[in-house]
Design a protein with these regions (language model features):
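FAD-binding core/adjacent interface of flavoenzyme oxidoreductases
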Residues: 1-4, 65-132
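Beta1-alpha1 glycine-rich phosphate/pyrophosphate-binding loop at the start
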Residues: 2-70
């Protein structure tokens, strides 16, 4: 069995780990446009200096080795072809799968409060790039 997991946030990481627990022999490939695993919930700690990028990581140090998960980082899935059981990455690479887990997360939302969206000191944090 070959699994592809798209997204390396909490859902993707835990999904990949759970897949491994259910299938010890499967090939599991986790694909993320991010270069780091990090908790989006505490990005504000990076902004105020309480944590470094490395300190935002919520996985054990040897996570990918321990669970035998191949991590393709810094690559974005640009196309999913369900009928062919494949994904295409932004560099043109095609990866085949038998099952896919989409764990791409959400997006930041600024509520429709008067003048809030126009304010220059309001920022929606979604990913590490927003905090840099």
């Amino acid at each position: 069995m070959a699994y592809v997991v798209v997204g390396a946030s909490a859902a993707g990481i835990n999904g990949a780990r759970t897949l491994r627990e259910y299938n010890k022999d499967a090939e599991i490939i986790l694909i993320s446009k991010d270069e780091h695993v990090y908790s989006r919930c505490i990005l504000h700690h990076y902004l105020d200096g309480r944590r470094t990028v490395e300190d935002l990581d919520f996985t054990p140090r040897e996570f990918f080795d321990k669970y035998n998960i191949k991590w393709i980082k810094g690559k974005e899935v640009t196309k999913i072809k369900p009928e062919e059981h494949s994904v295409t990455l932004d560099d043109g690479q095609e990866i085949k799968y038998e099952k896919i887990l989409l764990a791409t997360g959400a997006y930041s939302f600024i509520p429709p409060i008067e003048n809030l969206r126009e304010a220059n000191n309001v920022v929606g944090l979604r990913d590490l790039e927003d905090a840099l």
